[in-house]
């Protein structure tokens, strides 16, 4: 089975929602009570990041599946934006993660799928062309090593 990998280094953790305010990216925050204008602003910033990292002229046959590999520290849930600056400290030895992978993965999966359509790589992200998607977390020791690897799995 042939695969194409797209790498998205140092993916954004927060997006700017006003001059001085940032919001951490997450599916729950995006769709649970956020004003639709703010939601549009957030989605636009995520799409801009995705669009900048999708190679031009990528040619794939459909249908495809996708798999998102998320590389992030085990304590990714404790990443904060303070006065416009990201803050993170390595976890202590007995740290137990308490954040949901789904909240991080869903927003990226949707944006990456949309990015393939926008780049004319995929005609549409309906089940006719995109038949499966999944995701996995891989823990890294340093926050600066965070990245997304989006595998396009050629099903034919």
Protein language model features and the residues they cover:
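Catalytic phosphate/metal-binding cores of nucleic-acid and nucleotide-processing enzymes, i.e., regions
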Residues: 1-156
